[in-house]
Amino acid sequence: MTTIQLAVPEEASSRIRLGADLLKRSLLDIGLTIHEIGALTLAEYRNIAGIKLVIGNRLDHAFIRELEEHEVLLYHTNAPEGEGFYLASLPGNLIVIAGGSDTGVLYGCQELATIIAEKGGLPQELAFGDAPDMKLRGPVVPLQLTKVEPPRRTYEYPITPGRFPWFYDRALWLEYLDRLLEYRCNVVYIWTGHPFSSLVRLDSYPEAMEVTEAEFEQNVDTFRWLAEECDRRGIWLVLKFYNIHIPLPFAEKHKLDLHQPKPLPITSDYYIQSISTFIRTFPNVGLMVCLGEALQGALYGVEWFNETILVGVNEGLKDLKLKELPPIIVRAHAIPSEKVMEAAIPNYGNLFTEAKYNGESLTTFTPRGNWQDTHQHLSSLGSIHLFNVHILANLEPFRFGAPSFIQKCVQAAKYRLGCNGIHLYPLFYWDWPYSPDSVTPRLKQLERDWIWFAAWFRYAWKPDHHPALEREYWIGQFAKRYGSREAGEAVLDAYEESGECAPKLLRRFGITEGNRQTMSLGMTMSQLTNPDRYGPWKELWESQAPQGERLNLYVEREVRGEPHIGETPLDIADNVDAHAKNAERAIERARPYVVQNMEEFERIAIDVKAIALMTRSYTFKARAAIQILTYKLLSGQEFLNHVELLEAAIPAFEESLHNYRELAKLTDETYLYANSMQTPQRKVPFPDGEKFGHWRDCLPHYEQEFHSFTARVKELRNGDLPGGVASEERVGTYAQAEFVLHSSDAQTYVVDKQSKLFSDGNVLASNVAEELVGLTGIRINRDQASKEGVSIDIELKEPSRILVGYFNSKDSEWLQVPSLEENTHADDRGGLSPVIKNGLKVFFYPSVNVHAFLYEPGRHTLVFGQGSYLIVGVIKATQKMTVRDLEGASSLDTLDWLYENGKA
């Protein structure tokens, strides 16, 4: 029996020892014996009989350095650095695994162990070097739940066994971490709202702890163990937190809101102490910082990050002697992070930036526009820049595993965006670790979506494998799972074809790439033909899609006989229909050859069918929408003209509904829900992600929509204008609510034509909507608001809506409407969409849209952010408000009355 003489450094780190264990296991599996020996030298290693296997970090391994210096060990690739490694067979029966770091040694041992397992023996000739292209590579693990826990808000969940039993399951973690090592991940990002109240105890702020003493001890023990297990696999554990979030009991004691928009001395001190204590307790854990959403990052991001967060980090590190500084990652989310990084880079030596890839969906491998500019700028700042594959709201809840699409996305991140690291969300984020399949026991996402993780991390290591070789690789991976090459090839084809559908559908027809849209649940005809009503996010088609046309632009060009530019709605409809059909054929082609894992194969087949039905429900509805929009253009407001176009829309509209019915039926027993975020933040197709979380919940509304449409078309064909169309309702002034203005630097005024709108300057209203005339508005200082932001102290006597006017301009002097794409809490008080578009005209300035935000009785400090705005009234919350536009399209022109019970 052959004996391998294995030389492991006596002072080897846990990473190198783990690599040695992987090697030992592979050698024992092929029947070899292992004898561990001490350090070798160039002069004496030949005196030891048999095969010698030496592993070590070339930076501090004396024998490897000696081999290099005497040119016995030469590299035909780059000499290994960092996580790189080199495998070499050398004279005298010597095999060397040289790593550029301890992690490089681990990966080299892993590589040789894999070769041994595949070949069934030690290769005679070895000369192979490898290193990752991307600096950080890893997945997100969320400590989040699908529903909010009032009075806490979104993201806020203390870490307890009752909320997250899986977090304490060490066997589950070990399985997960071993898989990440298999994929050569070197980071795992744990996402929370405010973790410090569950992981650190502060003598100065005992009220900040949100868990019991027993839970705290369990948390610290679990987290320390987890950090150590990550470290021995070469994985950084990174903890994410939002700013400025504070613990509920801390907020209650100090009478503060849970989410703070600007730094206060007490919140800054609390964070400095929390972070420094955390660093001392868990020295090998990094931090990921979200400076947007609650914090007004444009105003206070630089101050908060540099004067609070980095102060806390450096305070925690000052007495520690670490070989590597923990990574600190700054999210470029709802904040111009360039200024933050410019100030921070001199203050810390291991900084990263991160930004979303395709927003909160997956839409294209050719990102462009503003978002491309943002990535490229961040990647030029001198720190490492990561791309974040985030939420995947358009892929939920189905399986996605199109390796060629994923490979091109990673290449785009590298070459188009300048990224050098990946931050990967699971496919069903909010319900981790479970998948949404209706299966008992519930499936784990790590197993169900194995190809999702495997493909992204394969290409994060090396993006540029040849496509033909990659096809063979993935056929082999599927063949192992389903028992034959024929099955592997066909299942791969099904994944590739079905994987094209959701990205293309969303980028051409969607309202947003943000997580307020659950794409698999469909879209209403109003959302397709009148998207402005639903706050469309233009970055979807201007940054996260190839050049092309939205439905309305396509119809306008078609009617005018103008040439089309880029991909059109009909291009995409025909294209994804073909992809869906090809996927259905491929999965059936696989069926006779599947000899193992039949249950999972059948679940994949159901997903392929579901994606095809979803696709056809979109494409036929889009074809109907083209007819309806053509009617809108040609008829003007002569609604009895060109009714034949509406009639022509009915067959496609009905076919869309038929496919949706089949989809609801198919998923009724196979899926628990469609969307992992079951909160009011989900708005499209219907408000409230909990109430409308399944296709069966949405189907009655789509049935009613089609019924209303056919009824309206019949009335129009008979020469009758539906009720509400013949005459629009008159509007009157809103009912004012009583309030007290406590701010000394603001003034009340009566809203009317010629009213002075700001306390400084002479900005006057030239026209005012009837609803607003006579209301009591509040004047602020325009210059101060545009440069610094202002706060308004107001006391309400009853439930009220505060009417905020946003100027229709993207110039930085004007406050911008909050968006759910950038702030999950943007619609907590309603008012995300305007109630009166162009409700005020202002001499020499842009027109003003009026939004209505709901507030409870009591005293409030209004802090909306940097930029000038108007407050044009405080009204009773109970009254009905009719949405309308004083300029351009009226509520009739939108044609929503065609689908919504005939009401304008």
Model-derived segments and their meaning:
Residues 2-5, 11-15, 19-22, 26, ...:
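Feature activates predominantly on carbohydrate-active enzymes
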Residues 28, 42-43, 166, 186, ...:
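Catalytic-core regions of glycoside hydrolase
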Residues 37-74:
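Short, well-ordered secondary-structure micro-motifs within conserved domains or adaptor modules
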Residues 426, 430, 438-687, 691-694, ...:
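C-terminal non-catalytic alpha-helical accessory regions
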Residues 728-786, 889-902:
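Glycan-recognition and processing domains
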Residues 782-784, 790-801, 850-859:
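Extracellular and analogous surface-interaction loops
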Residues 798-810:
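A short beta-strand element within beta-rich, extracytoplasmic domains
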Residues 814-882:
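Contiguous ligand/interfacial binding patches
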